[in-house]
């Protein structure tokens, strides 16, 4: 793709996200979401492969339907109450429509079916954008309207997302599909606490983006697409192998990694609000996600590829820019837990 066109698309994608995040008017927020969607469609389909075309078509249809539901929610509220302000949502039907529309854009269960298929059909860097940056605008709108969203719906979606994210990732060998189900499970943790403590949702989203970026940049650097390819990571560099292991363990939420802190705080908040059975269910469902993270770490770091040719370790990494971005993302994904008391005050 032409670098100028690529820059325009990335700039439009960022501008759409910022417009949606900062808007309190229904139409402006909808325009931001649409600009974001239309900018990433050419990025998804730029490889000229049938799977990329299929992924871009699925992504466009799902995002168009969710945008229509979002706009219908605003029009219904404006027709009944005469206001276009997002924070003045008084109709229950509009609240439910808004929740369903944003849940579809995020890929929350039970409207999650598009996310694994789309991520499997795109390159890893494009999958990274879909799994991280494309979650910012819908999640910002959910945080903006946290006091208007029906709590039973968010609790149900959150628990269902952690169950489906954990169960769906157990039998996956493609790494992109595994990261898609990981994204669904993490989104469940964010949504289940959003009407109780929205600041924890924002913290969880920030840490999730750091962890996922670190893991997927390692996959891109080592050209790993499946668990079988992950056996070759140790031939690139022992340091990269160690960073990949620690990033996956942080995604799984094992202490003392940074990924343990948001789960700990969310479980504590649920318990304080007398939702102990729900907190126990979330903790048990987190073990399902931890299972496939541990399987990926075992295969990538403790097993060798059954290759006839003796492979030498590639000590010289290919991309300086990718390595530098990975080196900036990895320390926060490992070392935030000791300073967590300062972050939550």
Curated annotation (Swiss-Prot):
Its main location: mitochondrion. It is a multi-pass membrane protein. The chain crosses the membrane at residues 1-21, 25-45, 60-80, 113-133, 148-168, 191-211, 239-259, 274-294, 324-344. Keywords: Electron transport, Membrane, Mitochondrion, Mitochondrion inner membrane, NAD, Respiratory chain, Translocase, Transmembrane, Transmembrane helix, Transport, Ubiquinone. It catalyses: a ubiquinone + NADH + 5 H(+)(in) = a ubiquinol + NAD(+) + 4 H(+)(out). It is an enzyme of class 7 (translocase). Belongs to the complex I subunit 2 family. It comes from Varanus baritji (Black-spotted ridge-tailed monitor). GO terms for cellular component: mitochondrial inner membrane. InterPro entries: Complex_I_Subunit_2, NADH_DH_su2_C, NADH_UbQ_OxRdtase_chain2, ND/Mrp_TM. It is found in: Mitochondrion inner membrane. Core subunit of the mitochondrial membrane respiratory chain NADH dehydrogenase (Complex I) that is believed to belong to the minimal assembly required for catalysis. Complex I functions in the transfer of electrons from NADH to the respiratory chain. The immediate electron acceptor for the enzyme is believed to be ubiquinone. One of its GO terms (biological process) is mitochondrial electron transport, NADH to ubiquinone. The lineage of its organism: Eukaryota, Metazoa, Chordata, Craniata, Vertebrata. GO terms for molecular function: NADH dehydrogenase (ubiquinone) activity. Its EC number is 7.1.1.2. The gene is MT-ND2. This is NADH-ubiquinone oxidoreductase chain 2. PANTHER family: NADH-UBIQUINONE OXIDOREDUCTASE CHAIN 2.
């Amino acid at each position: 793709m032409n670098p100028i066109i690529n820059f325009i698309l990335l700039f439009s994608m960022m501008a759409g996200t910022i417009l949606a995040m900062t808007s309190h008017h229904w139409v402006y927020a909808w325009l931001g979401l649409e600009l974001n969607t239309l900018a990433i469609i050419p990025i998804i389909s730029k490889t000229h492969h049938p799977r990329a075309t299929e992924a871009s078509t699925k992504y466009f249809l799902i995002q168009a339907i969710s945008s229509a539901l979002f706009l219908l929610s605003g029009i219904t509220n404006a027709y009944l109450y005469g206001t276009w302000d997002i924070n003045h949502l008084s109709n229950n039907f509009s609240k439910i429509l808004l929740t369903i529309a944003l849940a579809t854009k995020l890929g929350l269960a039970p409207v999650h079916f598009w996310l694994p298929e789309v991520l499997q059909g795109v390159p890893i860097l494009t999958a990274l954008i879909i799994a991280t940056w494309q979650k910012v605008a819908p999640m910002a709108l959910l945080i903006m309207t946290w006091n208007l969203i029906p709590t039973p719906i968010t609790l149900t979606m959150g628990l269902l997302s952690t169950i489906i994210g954990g169960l769906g990732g157990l039998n996956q060998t493609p790494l992109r599909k595994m990261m898609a189900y990981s994204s669904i499970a993490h989104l469940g943790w964010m949504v289940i606490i959003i009407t109780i403590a929205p600041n924890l949702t924002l913290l969880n989203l920030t840490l999730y983006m750091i962890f996922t970026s670190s893991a997927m940049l390692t996959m891109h650097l080592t050209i790993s697409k499946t668990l079988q390819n992950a056996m070759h990571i140790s031939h690139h560099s022992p340091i990269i192998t160690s960073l990949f292991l620690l990033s996956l363990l942080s995604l799984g939420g094992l202490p003392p990694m940074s990924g343990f802190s948001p789960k700990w705080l969310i479980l504590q908040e649920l318990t304080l609000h007398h939702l102990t059975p729900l907190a126990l269910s979330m903790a048990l469902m987190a073990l399902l996600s931890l299972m496939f993270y541990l399987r990926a770490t075992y295969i990538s770091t403790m097993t060798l590829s059954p290759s006839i040719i003796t492979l030498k370790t590639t000590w010289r990494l290919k991309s300086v820019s990718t390595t530098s971005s990975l080196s900036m993302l990895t320390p926060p994904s490992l070392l935030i837990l000791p300073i967590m008391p300062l972050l939550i005050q």
